[in-house]
């Protein structure tokens, strides 16, 4: 609901159908508990003759066309000197087969993938959203590959989430489970850093940077000695290090042809660009601060809360 700001028409009501009573209670909505399949069958029969206005159908078609153009722009943005992560997604979307599976879980990537990924089949898209479960991508690739040995399984992992669960790679190598890990190294937490900046906190503590000499704050010097590609090699993976999208595509074809678990390592731009988003999230801002950025963010927060609909 975009923190109660998305649905502004007071004449619209929602019927939520859930498979468990616990999840059925939504603010101001009718609550229905039903078997998912039976509910869909009943709704299909009930709404069989329903049609929206032709003007609305045309509006939807125009919006879809406009978004398709935006997807192409994000996939081929040509960011420099480092590629944007959306360019990596575009390359994968082009290279992966209809029955192959892409996996992701945490950070800014699930949002980007939801906005941009063009799934060719229902099985191709495997993304965990619920609690941004950092590290899920590493063991999830094992499970999906065991369930679908005929598919190429590609797990996209950020350098932040990788550090949560790399030890699972030992099992991947031990069992020679042929998966492809795509490691995007941007030396920081992209999603939470952007949120911090939008809340006036200037990305504090969200980048992998050396502490400044004589200071308690990090400067712009990337931490020396942390080598994730070398770490992956130490677990026994084949690692292909690339720097451009053209090199990435070539590396993917090599990984695809291999019979061993492989990581493709590429540095991407911490600052995007990312696909546009218009939803608002109610994340409170400090009401008292000496930082001008926080003071401005607090004023914006008070302004942006006004359109909220309080259903109860």
What spans do the regions from the language model cover?
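A diffuse structural propensity rather than consistent per-protein peaks
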Residues: 53, 83-84, 227, 244
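Glycine-rich, acidic loop regions that bind phosphate or pyrophosphate groups
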Residues: 1-62, 196, 256
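Structural signal for hydrophobic packing residues in well-ordered secondary-structure cores
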Residues: 40-51, 64, 68-71, 75, ...
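Short coil/turn segments at secondary-structure boundaries
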Residues: 55-59, 105-106, 266-267
């Amino acid at each position: 609901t975009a923190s109660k700001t998305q649905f502004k028409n007071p004449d619209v009501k929602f019927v939520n159908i859930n498979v468990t009573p616990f999840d059925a209670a939504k603010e101001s909505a009718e609550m229905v508990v039903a078997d998912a399949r039976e509910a869909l069958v009943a709704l299909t029969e009930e709404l069989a003759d329903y049609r929206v206005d032709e003007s609305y159908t045309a509006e939807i078609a125009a919006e879809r066309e406009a978004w398709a153009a935006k997807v192409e722009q994000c996939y081929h943005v040509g960011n420099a000197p480092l590629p944007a992560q959306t360019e990596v997604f575009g390359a994968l979307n082009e290279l992966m087969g209809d029955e192959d599976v892409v996996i992701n879980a945490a950070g800014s990537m699930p949002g980007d993938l939801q906005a941009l990924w063009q799934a060719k089949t229902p099985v191709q898209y495997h993304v965990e959203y619920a609690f941004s479960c950092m590290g899920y991508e590493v063991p999830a690739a094992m499970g999906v590959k065991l369930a679908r040995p005929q598919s190429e399984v590609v797990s996209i992992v950020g350098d932040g989430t990788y550090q949560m669960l790399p030890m699972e790679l030992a099992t991947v190598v031990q069992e020679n489970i042929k998966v492809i890990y795509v490691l995007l190294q941007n030396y920081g937490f992209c999603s939470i850093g952007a949120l911090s900046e939008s809340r006036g906190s200037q990305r504090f503590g969200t980048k992998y940077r050396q502490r400044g000499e004589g200071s308690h704050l990090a400067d712009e010097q990337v931490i020396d000695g942390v080598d994730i590609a070398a770490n992956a090699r130490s677990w026994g993976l084949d690692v292909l290090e690339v720097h451009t999208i053209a090199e990435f595509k070539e590396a993917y074809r090599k990984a695809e042809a291999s019979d061993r678990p492989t990581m493709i390592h590429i540095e991407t731009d911490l600052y995007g660009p990312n696909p546009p988003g218009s939803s608002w999230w109610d994340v409170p801002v400090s009401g008292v601060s000496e930082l001008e950025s926080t003071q401005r963010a607090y004023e914006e927060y008070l302004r942006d809360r006004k359109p909220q609909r309080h259903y109860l």
